[in-house]
Amino acid sequence: MDDGTSNKIDMVAGGTTIMKALVVYDSKFGNTERIAQVIGNALGSSYEVEVLQVGTMVPDPFEGLELLIVGSPTQQFNPTKGIKNFLKSLPSNGLKGIKVAAFDTRLTIEDIKEVAILSFFVRIFGYAAKPIANGLKRKGGELVLPPEGFYVQGMEGPLVEGEFERAEEWARQIIAAQ
């Protein structure tokens, strides 16, 4: 039953408490947003899920939270400034007791191989998901799966065929890891 509030902390359905999950993302061309929505929908079978763009965070989104997933496009081998600021803004041990996971969107291996210097820098600096995961762990979160990357065609996308299905499968793996 909806009591008119947009941010329910827990629901009780048939005597069982539904766990709360939050998917926070930033997106430049819409690809990361689409992956975040797919992940949120897939988690909906086991969680009460909110999917929010990093700049639209609600007050106290972590109250009652059991799972936090953060995603960003890879820009200059890092998460976006918005995601970096979000991670910095979290209090020390602010994610203690919360399961966490991280993902990014990135160029395909084929696109990277076409530019030798890009291949070199990717080998050195990597992608956005790993720094996101490290930031979540530094704030006390418990990483449930290794960081994941989803592929886009070229700099702006679209997503490579099959990435929505991979995102759904990754979300199912997160549920199974609980």
Please tell me what each predicted stretch does.
Residues 20-46:
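N-terminal beta1-alpha1 ligand-phosphate binding loop
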